[in-house]
Amino acid sequence: MDIKSIFNTIDKLNSRYVDVWEDVCNIESPSNFKEGVDAVSAYFIAIAESKGWKIERFPEDRFGDVVCITMNPDSDKAPVALSGHMDTVHPIGLFGTPATHREGDRIHGPGAMDCKGGVVAGFLAMHALDECGYTDRPVKMLLQSNEEIGSGINNKSPIKRICEEAKNAVAFLNLEGHEEYFKGKACVERKGIAGFLFRISGVSTHASYCAREGASAITEAAHKIIELEKVKEEGGVTFNCGVIKGGSVRNTVPGECEFQLDVRFSSQSDLERAKKIIQQVADTVYVPGCSCELTMTNLRPAMEKCERNLALLAIANAAFEKNGLTTLEAGMRTGGSDAADVTEYGIPCIDSLGVGGERAHSKEEFGVISSLSESAKRLVSIITAV
């Protein structure tokens, strides 16, 4: 294929897809708001219908539907899979009305960088390939619906569907965005994420009797949190206690308290070690009369460094160099993503190929407009090289 012609087509289509980017960010789609997530997928489905691509929708009861859009579905070769998530973090209305605005080279709004901008770059790449007559392989766009809540322990259906649809792919290109510090890198390794809920029961009594009776669930929680927060290994396991709830009034010894623990880990062995520490802290009674119930609330595996992902990056870098793009170093990210599940499935995968930006998961989130075309050009370079 004439890569120069494809790049020129990307440049020609770019402004149209910047508008698409703004449109989909204005459709607010928190993970638990199925109507909003489905509205985002409906927008992308309309683009696919206009191009005559194959569309498959996989219904979900609690979350947005998973959608698979395929260009060149009749090719007998193994597909290339692109994937990004449509859901965002914050409740509707936090960003104002409209939710999105442009400022210089930035689009501000929910999901601008994480991850709607990357999905738009994927559609831009597919549109340009289609317009330039690319028919070699199927190209699948897999739209995930609940990534931001961890594709969790009790809600794995969407990511399982993504992995099943991509299981024969020669490459899985995940479209998460990247900050300035990660520019020039491709993610081939990510930490895993586990969540735990500690529910502590104490003995409630009048505050004036606390010297001789009662057992404060909040005090027990405080001891446990201090012990857990000691675990902060730069390259390994980290513990963060992010939410605590306990007590009801000032003048009562609290009989109930609960807190949530976020765990990041680099490998399965790290996770097993972390679980032993957590269980030991849960079982230890610091305040006589208290007890603790421990529950794992979510689990996302680590994306461990592996040869097939490094081999795919080598192919990508050869294509980048050939096509006048800068090569990317192998990098590790401490945040989780669906690329971990995909890697565990045995599919060659590179992550963080979406748009540039900053401040993901905050009211100040933005994507860098000029990064859209570069992301699309990297994607078509890989697609035409594998």
Give short role names for the model-derived ranges.
Residues 1-5, 12, 29, 47, ...:
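Metal-dependent amide/peptide-bond hydrolase catalytic core
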Residues 2-110, 131-134, 320:
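Acidic/His- and Gly-rich active-site-bordering loop/insert found
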Residues 83-84, 142-144, 172-176, 199-201, ...:
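Short beta-strand segments
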Residues 90, 106-121, 206:
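Glycine/serine-rich anion-binding loops at beta->alpha junctions
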Residues 103-105, 125-140, 228-237, 386:
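Phosphate-handling active-site elements
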Residues 109-113, 144-150, 207-215:
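Flexible, glycine/proline-enriched loop segments at strand-loop-helix junctions
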Residues 115-189:
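Acidic/histidine-rich catalytic neighborhood of metal-dependent amide-processing enzymes
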